[in-house]
């Protein structure tokens, strides 16, 4: 396992994920509405439409996760890492880096500090769920300390390792 490449690829993946997500949310916060805390979604005068939900999931799957899975698998294989478990460990480390950069860059710095007013969904202004403590306690920390490390990262790491093995077989 190439540790330097793993860390650098993790930062590259985190940069792509966070910059793309941040730009989309800054452009039009409603596009990210399905990933807002449930209390804010329920309080909205206009809840997310089917088209918005569909766009969000297509964008997350094909605009965010799939390119990162491909990049992670190809880069790891090109770095000389082979075998399912080394590939999965590399993928897990990279996805955890994406996770923690998402927590610190998007949830903590950008949404709660730097550009808070730009992330407010029209019709939910003044909702207590946008407060720092509520956002972190009810949404960001459970997502980034429970959901990502124990569900998302293992699934994405296994998918990335499997993709790496397929690349090794057919490339």
Give a label for each model feature.
Residues 2-21, 85-101:
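Alpha-helical transmembrane segments
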Residues 23-66:
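Cytosolic-side membrane-entry/anchor segment at the start of a transmembrane helix
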Residues 39-52, 121-142:
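Short membrane-interface loop/juxtamembrane segments of multi-pass integral membrane proteins
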Residues 46-52, 77-84:
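Membrane-interface helix-boundary motifs at transmembrane edges
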Residues 56-75, 141-157:
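Core segments of transmembrane alpha-helices
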Residues 89-107, 132-147:
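C-terminal halves and exits of single transmembrane alpha-helices
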Residues 105-128:
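Juxtamembrane non-transmembrane "cap" segments at the membrane-aqueous interface
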Residues 158-171:
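Juxtamembrane boundary at the C-terminal end of a transmembrane helix
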